Structure formats: C-alpha cells, structure tokens
C-alpha cells in the first residue's frame, strides 16, 4: 500500500511539473511580416500600422528579417521610423542586422536557404495611447537594388 501511494505521488508531481514547464507566457502584443520585392528597391518603404497601445510601457521592439543566401553582404542596414510616442512626431534611427558572420555562415535560424534573424531595436518605447502608431522600414544600403531579402517584420513586446 505504501508503494502505491509513493508511485501515485511521483506520477502527480511529474504531471504538475510537466504542466508547469509546458505553459509559456508570450508577451508579444504585435507581430507582423510583410514580403518585399526581390530586388528590394531603396525607395520602397514597408509600413506597419499598429493598434492603439495602452498608455505606459515600456515596450520593446524587435525587427525581424527573412533572407536567403543570395544576399550579397554580411550586414543589412535599415532605416526605421516610428511615431509611437507622439503621433505627430516621427523618430528616425538606423539598425544594423548582421545576417552573416565573418566566415559567411548565417547568423539567423532557418533551413533550406531561407533564414530569419531578430535584431533588437529599442527596449524603452512609451506610447502616448492616443492613436494608432506606425513603423516605416526601408533599407539604407548603397545598392539601390537589394537582392536576397524576402520579408521584414516588427515585433512589439510588453
């Protein structure tokens, strides 16, 4: 009888631990990708219209890039504009996405020649909560025709 109780306890503890480790709280409040033309022209802007955020924060923002081995450089430079903190004011910044390391291997995750890399943009975004916000993303590479980029995405986390 004592062994039966012990086995039941072990099974229950195992069950509870399994349930606790399988639960995952995802703090993403916005995540979306847009496909870009190949080649991606320098004047083409990808626009993300985000829902109204609750006032406060801070929120963190990441830029996701999907790319192929045909991308001719190690790094991708992006120009990112947003009006999250004040809908009438646009903030502009550049972000460096290191797609390949010095040995030529992809820095992102992926299979079959398509990779994805997430690069932090900011960790201290505090929206005013009054209107929807926008992000605008375009490449600022010296080549006006950029090959090998398939998608660009924005992820906002609380």
Which sequence ranges carry the predicted segments?
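Bacterial N-terminal signal peptides that target proteins for export
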Residues: 1-12
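C-terminal motif of bacterial Sec signal peptides marking the signal peptidase cleavage site
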Residues: 19-22
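Bacterial signal peptide processing site
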Residues: 24-27
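Post-signal-peptide N-terminal segment of Sec-exported extracytoplasmic proteins
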Residues: 45-73
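Noncatalytic modules at the cell exterior or secretory-pathway interfaces
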Residues: 55-63, 123-141
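Short acidic/polar inter-strand loop motif in beta-rich domains
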Residues: 67-70, 115-125, 139-149
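Exposed low-complexity, polar/acidic, P/S/T/G-rich flexible segments that act as propeptides
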Residues: 78-83, 142-158
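An anionic, turn-rich surface loop/hairpin at beta-sheet edges
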Residues: 95-126
């Amino acid at each position: 009888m004592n062994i039966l109780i012990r086995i039941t306890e072990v099974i229950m503890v195992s069950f509870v631990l399994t349930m606790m480790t399988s639960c995952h709280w995802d703090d993403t409040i916005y995540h979306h990708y847009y496909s870009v033309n190949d080649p991606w022209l320098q004047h083409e802007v990808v626009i993300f219209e985000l829902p109204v955020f609750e006032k406060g924060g801070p929120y963190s923002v990441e830029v996701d890039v999907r790319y192929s081995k045909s991308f001719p450089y190690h790094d991708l430079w992006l120009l990112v504009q947003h009006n999250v903190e004040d809908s009438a004011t646009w903030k502009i910044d550049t972000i460096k996405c290191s797609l390949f390391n010095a040995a030529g291997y992809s820095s992102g995750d992926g299979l079959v020649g398509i990779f994805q890399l997430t690069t932090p943009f900011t960790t201290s975004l505090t929206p005013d909560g009054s209107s929807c916000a926008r992000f605008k993303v375009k490449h600022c590479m010296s080549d006006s025709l950029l090959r090998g980029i398939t998608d660009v995405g924005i992820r906002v986390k609380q």
